[in-house]
């Protein structure tokens, strides 16, 4: 949407470098000038049906850049202003590693757009002292999961588990139409509760609304099933549109500026939010292990998909040759 708006705000002679004159002139500009919501509906319709040059935006950042003649390296720029994409097929940074260390980078890897995960920034931005929030987070998610601002530590398993929790919980929130900016209720303003919230509240909420019994563990499982479906669909999409279903190499590649910014600092020195390349590869290994994804390709294994009653998706991945991209011996050796 950001790129669409930038093009359409350009003067006609500039915009028609990216879309044809006929397409530009066919747009219902009277609706746009009048603030008529049909303007947005028409733009969305054209993108959904692949009509015109502008519709490439719906295919993601990589396809858009290819069409407009921009190399992938354009997103490696460390200019601090016009480039903030964390991944090459992602969206300008919104709640990533600058606020949530490796956890923020990991959960961004799952999506093709703004991941809209606020589970960490709601804690870092709560106004509570660091030591108070750290105690709450570590009691819920394990020692070492929560870093101080601009004082990051190397990846550990609890950070990877927290990232996976955030992804699954966000996918549940999307399905339940709950606001991820408010839920889950991780912290409490109550001193008597030692500022601990109640992660079970959303399960209680679901139970009250539906009349069926829900638990937090059950919601995590339901959210992870969605995560696995999304990941399998992403592999199919990348195979069809990018010619490769190796998600680790293509989809989960991180732009250089994340590691190269603030050159006066090294990663893990106090005063910077930059990440370390080798550390993030280790983080991916831990993250993939938690989700049951092949470490070489980042694709859910057949065993993982069948665990979530998604054997039909595993059959589809196999039929498309997506599982064939990793030699059996290499997978077993891992």
Language-model features, listed with the residues they occupy:
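Extended C-terminal regions of large enzymes
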Residues: 1-334
